[in-house]
């Protein structure tokens, strides 16, 4: 069992997404620790990119603030290495293929292993092109996380059969952001996934309330929340950690209930 799968072994997982360097890395570190102390089972860390095509305005804004603040991939690597001294839950990077290519794919992925990153999510990487990264990820023991959006049963089955770490089920087509209602038939997608793999699956995109998180975790193995956390960070800045702590606790309590 990979370290990522182990995060799902003790019940439903809560997975927060946090953009590195928004508003600064010191605050990011405090937010990560606050999330873990209040029940986060796995942390998704966003490496900012100037053209984040999967993101809505909230996370796009976080990317731009971090980039304006001088964030770089190397600074994030050094930051994670330091964070790993006391943060023991699995951590994955979410970024874009161009970030990995421009750094050098093997150098990027081997550094992930060296600093304690357990997986990599590339939302702009089509399933058909994953072989560009998969052999290197396997060589260095970094899970390449598959995303499944609402699509045909055959395609869901195909992606699920080859998945590793966990499967990120996208709740609805479009970009990230909070939604008042999620209308996709996610239970059917999860059923197809489970017929094809034992790899756990978590649902993300659009989840912001404890009620939504519970509903998604009841269907799947966990809930992923990004924009709602980024909104707290944008609103409270360096005071965000205490607010994120409270929010994560409410979400984790909901999915446990």
Where in this protein do the model-derived segments appear?
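N-terminal amphipathic alpha-helix/helix-capping segment at the start of soluble metabolic enzymes
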Residues: 1-18, 81-85, 256
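Glycine-rich beta-to-alpha transition loops that act as phosphate-gripper elements at the mouths
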Residues: 19-24, 94-102, 126-127, 147-151, ...
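Catalytic cores of alpha/beta
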Residues: 25-34, 151-161, 203, 207-223
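Glycine-rich phosphate-binding active-site loops on the catalytic face of alpha/beta enzymes
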Residues: 41-51, 117-121, 126-129, 171-177, ...
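Alpha/beta catalytic cores of nucleotide-metabolism and tRNA/nucleoside-modifying enzymes
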Residues: 76, 191-199, 208-257
